[in-house]
């Protein structure tokens, strides 16, 4: 059986590889976030276009079946690679050869037309299998080691050879699908071929995140500020807390992390609560813990403003979700947020790690409700014109078609063997 490379107008058999970010995972954990959503929504939108999609993710529990139908046209395949239990993603590199071997074995019997790997370690495993079988490979990084190392420095727990592997994957794949302009600049600095890079942003479901509908409860006579995301320091919750003394009439809702029943035991929540007590704003901050995705639209609609103050953000889906709900956004001018949030039309962009600038931007919108409402309407229009999953899937499919039409114009060496601590 061979892929249908000679049928460019036919529906495609697509393999999405997402080694640590299962589309079936609950969101809010340290390693569960935007990539999980992206892979799930992209797969569904590609299936809506008539394609068959298989998603490959690592088996992290012994009782998981080999395959799980996610919806019509989409199946999640669990790959045995390393122990069948949750592992931090920074510990998964030694298990990528086994992951790649599994892919090669399965694809030899049923080869996809195109492979699209998500995250760099997925790229390592996918490159191993794709090159062995002559399959076309697209790569989306979602985050780059150069950026993480620059910002986290000694706190970066990535494997020491991550950047070298990211470069090797970028050199070996047929197309890099970047998510924003900042990422393209980073890839150029890594020396990767700009002619093989296509920008396709992440998306949002504008039929789910809508301006009208039920809203979550909110405090009386106070502005509601909402911050949503994984509870890790780089997401900037500490900056929002530090800004709150300058916003005496606002309440801050921080959404994310462990389930609500466990939130008070979370080390990051404890750290942030200590900062809130020191700042004298503990009575105006609520930590909800992780909430089900279906609750998010009502919560975002209830907010006066949504805050996205990350130190760095490879893309950032929360601004899109807020804008789709018609809620203005105050975000840091980093990564994909520089593309999605248009200052002053859909919200405000501020420097990272600057509580005073964040507070000033928030106060400016809270004190100008007509301007804030106009930002919300403009944000909704921007989502509809640029970021619906139908548009994202069409652009992604176009990148796949380009790869298939071009074939392998450049012969590349086989992917080297991966080993613990090995340099590519």
Enumerate the language-model features and the residues they cover:
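N-terminal subdomain of nucleotide-sugar transferases
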Residues: 1-68, 72-78, 408, 412, ...
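Carbohydrate-associated surface elements
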Residues: 182, 203
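Conserved donor-binding/catalytic core segment of Leloir-type glycosyltransferases
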Residues: 217-235, 241-247, 253-255
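Nucleotide-activated donor-binding/catalytic signature segment of Leloir-type glycosyltransferases, i.e.
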Residues: 266-294
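Short alpha-helical donor nucleotide-sugar binding micro-motif in glycosyltransferases
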Residues: 290, 298-303
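Aromatic "clamp/platform" in nucleotide-sugar-dependent glycosyltransferases that forms part
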Residues: 311
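Short hydrophobic beta-strand element within catalytic cores of glycosyltransferases
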Residues: 328-331, 341
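Conserved acidic donor-binding segment of nucleotide-sugar-dependent glycosyltransferases
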Residues: 343-344, 348-355, 364-369
């Amino acid at each position: 059986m061979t892929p249908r490379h000679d049928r460019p107008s036919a529906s495609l058999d697509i393999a999405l590889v997402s080694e640590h970010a299962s589309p079936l995972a609950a969101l809010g954990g340290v390693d569960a976030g935007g990539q999980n959503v992206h892979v799930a929504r992209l797969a569904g939108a590609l299936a809506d276009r008539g394609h068959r999609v298989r998603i490959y993710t690592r088996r992290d529990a012994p009782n998981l079946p080999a395959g799980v139908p996610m919806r019509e046209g989409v199946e999640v395949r669990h790959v045995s690679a390393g122990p069948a239990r949750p592992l931090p993603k920074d510990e998964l590199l030694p298990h990528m050869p086994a992951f790649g071997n599994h892919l090669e074995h399965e694809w030899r019997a049923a080869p996809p037309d195109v492979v699209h790997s998500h995250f760099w370690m997925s790229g390592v495993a996918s490159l191993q299998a794709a090159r062995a079988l002559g399959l076309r490979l697209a790569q989306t990084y979602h985050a780059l080691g150069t950026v993480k190392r620059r910002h986290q420095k000694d706190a970066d727990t990535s494997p020491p050879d991550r950047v070298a592997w990211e470069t090797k994957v970028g050199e070996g794949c047929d197309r890099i699908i970047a998510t924003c302009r900042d990422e393209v600049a980073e890839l150029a600095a890594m020396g990767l071929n700009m002619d093989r890079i296509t920008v396709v942003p992440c998306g949002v479901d504008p039929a789910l995140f809508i301006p009208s509908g039920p809203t979550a409860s909110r405090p009386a006579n106070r502005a509601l500020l909402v911050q949503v995301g994984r509870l890790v320091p780089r997401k900037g919750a500490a900056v929002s807390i530090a800004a709150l003394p300058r916003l005496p009439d606002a309440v801050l809702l921080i959404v994310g992390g462990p389930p609500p029943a466990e939130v008070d035991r979370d080390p990051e929540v404890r750290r942030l609560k200590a900062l809130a007590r020191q700042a004298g704003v503990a009575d105006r901050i609520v930590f909800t813990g992780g909430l089900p995705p279906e609750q998010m639209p009502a919560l975002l609609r209830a907010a006066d403003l949504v805050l996205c103050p990350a130190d760095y953000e490879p893309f950032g889906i929360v601004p899109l979700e807020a804008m789709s709900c018609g809620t203005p956004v105050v975000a840091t001018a980093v990564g994909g947020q520089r593309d999605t949030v248009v200052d002053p039309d859909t919200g405000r962009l501020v420097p990272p790690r600057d509580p005073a600038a964040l507070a000033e931007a928030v106060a400016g919108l809270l004190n100008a409700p007509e301007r804030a409402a106009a930002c919300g309407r403009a944000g909704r229009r921007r989502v509809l014109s640029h970021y619906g999953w139908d548009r994202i899937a069409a652009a992604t499919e176009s990148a796949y078609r380009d790869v298939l039409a071009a074939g392998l114009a450049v012969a590349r060496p086989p992917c080297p063997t991966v080993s613990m601590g090995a340099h590519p």
